[in-house]
Swiss-Prot record:
Gene3D superfamilies, A to Z: ACT-like. Chain A, domain 2 (3.30.70.1150), Met repressor-like (1.10.1220.10)
A biological-process GO annotation: response to nickel cation
Organism taxonomic ancestry: Archaea, Methanobacteriati, Methanobacteriota, Stenosarchaea group, Methanomicrobia
Keyword Plastid set for record: no
Function: Transcriptional regulator.
NCBIfam families in the record: PRK01002.1 (NF002169), PRK02967.1 (NF002815), PRK04460.1 (NF003381)
Binding site for Ni(2+): H81, H92, H94, C100
Membrane-crossing segments per the record: none
Co-factor remark: Binds 1 nickel ion per subunit.
Cofactor: Ni(2+)
Organism: Methanosarcina mazei (strain ATCC BAA-159 / DSM 3647 / Goe1 / Go1 / JCM 11833 / OCM 88) (Methanosarcina frisia)
Domain of life assignment: Archaea
Family: Belongs to the transcriptional regulatory CopG/NikR family.
InterPro entries, per the entry: Acetolactate_synth/TF_NikR_C, ACT-like_dom_sf, Arc_rbn_hlx_hlx, CopG, CopG/NikR_regulator, Ni_resp_reg_NikR, Ribbon_hlx_hlx, TF_NikR_Ni-bd_C
Protein name according to UniProt: Putative nickel-responsive regulator 3
Length: 140
């Protein structure tokens, strides 16, 4: 990757930008641009990590989403039903009036777990997703 810096423009909700700026100040970043570069590097590293998840795994997928967004709840349920053979359990609770937190506990092949997580993350209204996996240990 070259050293040339590219100028880009992005649109963000004001509340998200304010929170980002406060985080940058607390962490001592010299500029918003450096914070965005760091966030993109972290995002890319996470994507690379997800590509390496292979083999039999136990996992949790933690999701925060806006349940007032049209279709988010039904789409989430439809996707989960496609992976019903992998999902052991899920827990759902309301954080606020329009904000829900859900944890899905599952077991399956790493590639399928990642596929499920990526499909959920692509739903409009999903604000946060965290995937945690543990390789299955074989008893010998």
């Amino acid at each position: 990757m070259g050293k040339k810096l590219m100028r880009i423009g992005i649109s963000l909700p004001g509340e998200l930008l304010d929170k980002f700026d406060k985080t940058l100040m607390k962490r001592g970043y010299s500029s918003r641009s450096e914070g965005i570069r760091d966030a993109i590097r972290t995002y890319n590293q996470h994507y690379e990590w997800m590509k390496q998840i292979r083999g039999s795994r136990s996992a949790t997928i933690s999701i925060v989403y806006d349940c007032s967004k049209k279709g988010v709840t039904s789409t989430l349920a439809e996707i989960q039903h496609e992976y019903v053979d992998m999902i052991s359990s899920s827990v759902h609770f309301h954080m606020e009036e329009d904000l829900c937190f859900e944890v899905i506990i599952l077991r399956g092949e790493g590639e399928q777990i990642v596929d499920l997580a990526q499909r959920i993350l692509s739903i409009k209204g999903v604000k946060h997703l965290r995937l945690t996996t543990v390789p299955e240990e074989k008893n010998e």
